[in-house]
A protein has these predicted regions:
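Conserved nucleotide-sugar phosphate-binding/catalytic loop shared by glycosyltransferases and other
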Residues: 6, 29-30, 34-87
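Active-site-proximal region of nucleotide-activated glycan assembly enzymes
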Residues: 123-138
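Conserved nucleotide-sugar donor-binding subdomain of glycosyltransferases
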Residues: 72-107, 113-115
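Hydrophobic/aromatic ligand-binding patch that stacks against planar heteroaromatic rings
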Residues: 26, 118-119
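Extreme N-terminal starter segment of soluble prokaryotic enzymes
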Residues: 1-5
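A short, glycine/small-residue-rich beta-strand->loop->alpha-helix junction that serves as a flexible
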Residues: 8-21
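Histidine-centered beta-alpha loop that forms part of the nucleotide-sugar donor binding/catalytic region
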Residues: 9, 113, 131-134
Length: 138
């Protein structure tokens, strides 16, 4: 049985999860083991209701409030406020790598998850990065 893991780290709307639904259904129909590593378990449970998908909470990073940008007008600003420039970056990457080791997926499907993408540069799990031009950094 193949194992896949979907990730969602940043952003607020259900669109980050809904786009996964057709692929998750197909994988489940193939009898694959499907995981979702998400920032909001409640939203994931609503979207994947009725599917045998394992849902795990991840803790998105953040920069201490005093160091955050007040106005966000670019992707680097979002990354800054999400902990990329904080002392906790190494812990965030280690947490993702730990989750990948625990689950051992054969495929990652990544949506608006920059720390997961960075951690996967180390883990080297085959991956698909999905999203809009804004949520997929170069």
């Amino acid at each position: 049985m193949a194992r896949s893991a979907f990730t969602w780290e940043l952003g607020q709307g259900l669109g980050h999860l809904v786009r996964y639904l057709p692929l998750a259904r197909t994988l489940v129909e193939r009898d694959d083991d499907v995981w979702c590593l998400v920032k909001n378990v409640g939203q994931a449970e609503r979207v994947f209701s009725g599917l045998p998908v394992r849902i795990e909470q991840i803790e998105p990073g953040s920069t201490p409030r005093a160091q955050q940008l007040r106005t966000l007008n670019s992707y680097p600003g979002i990354l800054r406020n999400s902990g990329v420039y904080s002392d906790a970056l190494e812990k965030q990457i280690a947490a993702w790598i730990g989750m990948f080791c625990q689950i051992d997926p054969g495929l990652l499907v990544i949506d608006h998850s920059p720390m997961a993408m960075l951690a996967n540069r180390i883990s080297k799990i085959p991956s698909i990065v999905s999203g809009t031009g804004f949520t997929v950094p170069p």
